[in-house]
């Protein structure tokens, strides 16, 4: 017991600066959240969750266009807490998932801190969006992760292609089916229960097309190149950022996926985060 206690103390002492930096970032972003109302995207998830709890289709809320399992975390919050408090907790959960994703992808503490204060991350958190859930899917086995990363296809489509091609190369169609079957069943059941809810995505596009930052179709070759590089090098890190380049609809916070691909390249991440903040302040 004494030896284990001493080891824990040594670990804390050796990592105290890293721990302090992380806690400071967490507290600053949290305080900023508490000063603001929950973001408009939280309104969407809150309203869709309430409809589901009332036995109605969450897609009656016309700007909810994610699969029904994207509400797995918001539903308990809606049951227990008022909207504002639930929104604040949602914000904290977002920070946790962003941080745990960076940790599971072997980011150094400085890289994790840069990722948490990057403009796309802050934008996602303040708007109450859910990018942290599909990004967390990057760290899961493909047969589970596919369910998560396709919550936002503009984030996960590149990695989905990579997983499927890798599965085919290593185990043929049988392995591909094993990977895609849980997600395929989930989508089929959702269509049976709620109809072709994907049409709501077009409503989202109409509402937010003014904020579309997609570089499509000019960015498609780059997205495909990242997938090819990842397959050749057998390294999914290359593919993490491919999704936004392949999608015709990309809001600013979706570019977080590109930052995830740079979590193990601290200096590059540092300069990109600084550049993004310069652009943000210039545009204000």
PLM regions with names:
Residues 2-139, 143, 164-266, 270, ...:
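Primarily membrane-embedded glycan-assembly and transfer machineries that use lipid-linked glycans
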Residues 148-149, 154-166, 258:
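Transmembrane-embedded, aromatic-rich helix segments that form part
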